[in-house]
Amino acid sequence: MNGNQAIDWRIGCSGYYYKEWKDIFYPAGLPQKDWFGYYCQHFNTIEINSSFYKQPSLKSFNTWYDQSPADFLFTIKAPRTITHYNKFHDSAGLITDFYQVIKTGLRDKLGCALFQLPPSFSYTEERLSLLLNNLDQALKNVIEFRHISWWNNTVMTEFKNNQLTFSGLSYPSALPDGTIQFNNPVYYRFHGKPILYKSLYTEQEIITFAKSIMPGTKQVFVYFNNTWGESALTNAKQLIALTDLKL
């Protein structure tokens, strides 16, 4: 994949604190408090999903910042109060608070803010306007949809015009699984398919994905959420090798 050397590849897993990774990734005897530092030796980014359930404290973000290398980047998933409960209605204050804590805590290591919408959140003009009017274009905002109605030309055009990233995904459903490349950064989530969170992708599938990234792309964030067992670790390392990423 030497043709993609100019791309800033950010490859990692959706989280790091998995007890089943003990002995298969984390060395025996390594204290759990040192797991994140060990993770950072192997990957240059992480997608934090625990923030979906409870927003981490500023102290947690500061700790992650201090424990990670200078060029490490974080993606933080927005709380479900914004995306699943309120569905962006009456959420301006919540979004501002979310932005504030991740910017303050992660500073120059903040990669993306991820907003994952539920399958019940289908496309309407009103909902598209809610997204466009509530997101701060000064940040790298990534939206992951789970309803196929969002794959339409109007959405793609508005996202491009407003510097929003439409997340590609591999998910056990009928949703399209191609990469969506009209704004930098490109963002893709491997959730496990056909078995959610579990299935290992073949090396050929990883090669096909890497080759799909168009020349001229500046930055790509790729996260493996098939974190059951070794699947995410194996696939992430395969992609790192394919992209000649030196860690």
Regions found by a protein language model. Name each.
Residues 1-247:
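Residues lining hydrophobic/aromatic ligand-binding pockets adjacent to catalytic sites
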